[in-house]
C-alpha cells in the first residue's frame, strides 16, 4: 500500500505543471490525439514476443481438413437452402483463418466487390485487419457491403491485434495487454454485466476468446455482427430473443421453415459448464504457460487440445492420469454424439414430412405450429453441436439441450402425422437416399459440379488479384 501511495504522489507532482499551464493558457486547447493505427501484420511483433509469435505460427501445423458433411450427410438436409449444405469443415489452426473463409464453398465465387451471397460481416472473426478497418472506417463503414469488398483488405490471419493492444507501451515491453478489438463484442459483454475494463484478469482471458467463439447473427440492413444475449446466454434465452425480433438466418428449402443457424458458441457453453463456473479460462486449457529453450515461461499460442500439454493444463487441477481423463472425455463425447444422431434423424424426417404436407396443400396457418417446433428443435440441436468442445466444456448442458431438441422434434412429427392424415396421407413419407454427402446434396437439388467449378475459377483468378493489391498497399509482410 505504501508503494502505491508513493507512486501516486510522484505522478501527481509531475502533473501539477500541466494543470498550471492549462489554467493559464486555457484558450490554447490541445488537439485530440490521433489514434494509433492498428497494425495487422503479425510478423511486426515477433521481435518483442518471439516465443509467442513462433508458437502462434505453429498453428499452421494444424492443417488437416475434416469434411463434416461427409462424416454426417444428415447435415445437408438440415441446412437445405443454406450455404452450409454445400461445404462444412471442422475447424483447424488459426493460421488458416483467411484461407479457409476464402476457399469455402459457402462464400461463393464473387467476380467483383458487389457480387456474392454473403456480407462483409463474414470476415469478422478471421483477421486483425478487421480491427484495423473498424478503427479506420467505423463499424458502419466496415460492415457495409458484400464479403468480396473486403478481399484486398483482410489478408492477415487471426493474430496479435485481435486480442492485444499492440500499440501500448506495455505490449512493447512484453506484457499481454489484452483488449476487445471488436466493439460489438464489448457491447455484448456489457449487456451481460461484464464490462471488459472492470473485469479481472481471468475473466478478460476468456472474454478475448469470446469475441469470436460465440453465437452471433447479422443485424439490420448493414448486416452488422450482434450477439443475441439481451435476454441471457442460455439456449432458451437466445431462442426467445430471436423469436421476439422475428429473425431467421434462412428458410429451409424442404420444410419452408424459417431457421436459425448456430455458429460456434464456445463462450456460452464454457460459461454453463464446470470450468466456466470455476473461472478455469480458455487460456488455462488451450494456451498454457510453457518453457522456452532458456527455461523462460511464456504463453503457448499454438492453441490446441489440452491433452497435448497435459502436464501444463489438466494436471494443474486433476489428480487422475492422462489416460483416465481421456476415457472420461471420450465417453462424454460418445454420449453426446449418440443423442445428436437421434435428434438429426428426427429432424430429417420432420423436414421431408413438412414438405409432403405443403405439397398436399397445407396452409400457412396449419404449418405454423409445426414449423415453430422444427425451428426450435433444430436451433437447440445446433447450439449443442456447433461448439465442437461441448463434451469437455459443458457435457450436461449439451445433453440437456439435445434432450429438449428431441422433444420438440417429436412434437413436430406428431403434429405432422395428424395434419397429413387430414390430407389423406396415412402412409410413411419416404426419405431419399442420403447415405453420402453427394447423394444428400443431390436430394436437395444442388449442382455441386457447377458450384465447385465456379469456386476453383475464383481461387485461381480473384484471390491472386486481392493479394497483389494488398501487397501494393503495404498490408502484407513481403
UniProtKB/Swiss-Prot annotation:
Reactions performed catalytically: 6 Fe(III)-[cytochrome c] + NH4(+) + 2 H2O = 6 Fe(II)-[cytochrome c] + nitrite + 8 H(+)
Binding-site positions, heme c 3: 94, 209, 212-213
This enzyme's EC code(s): 1.7.2.2
InterPro entries: Cyt_c552 (IPR003321), Cyt_c_NO2Rdtase_formate-dep (IPR017570), Multihaem_cyt_sf (IPR036280)
Alphabetical list of Gene3D superfamilies matching this protein: Butyryl-CoA Dehydrogenase, subunit A, domain 3, Flavocytochrome C3, Chain A
One record GO biological process: anaerobic electron transport chain
UniProt remark on cofactor binding: Binds 1 Ca(2+) ion per monomer. Binds 5 heme c groups covalently per monomer.
Record: residues binding heme c 5: 275, 314, 317-318
Pfam families xref list: Cytochrom_C552
Binding-site positions, heme c 2: 160, 163-164, 301
Binding site for heme c 4: 282, 285-286, 393
Coarse class of the protein's main subcellular location: periplasm
Signal peptide: 1-26
GO terms for cellular component: outer membrane-bounded periplasmic space
Associated pathway: Nitrogen metabolism; nitrate reduction (assimilation)
GO MF annotation list: calcium ion binding; heme binding; iron ion binding; nitrite reductase (cytochrome, ammonia-forming) activity
UniProt keyword annotations, A-Z: Calcium, Electron transport, Heme, Iron, Metal-binding, Oxidoreductase, Periplasm, Signal, Transport
Chain residues that bind substrate: 216, 264
Necessary cofactors: Ca(2+); heme c
Subcellular location: Periplasm
Keyword Transport among record annotations: yes
PANTHER family membership: CYTOCHROME C-552, CYTOCHROME C-552 RESPIRATORY NITRITE REDUCTASE
Family statement drawn from the similarity comment of this UniProt entry: Belongs to the cytochrome c-552 family.
The protein's role, per its UniProt record: Catalyzes the reduction of nitrite to ammonia, consuming six electrons in the process.
Record protein name field: Cytochrome c-552
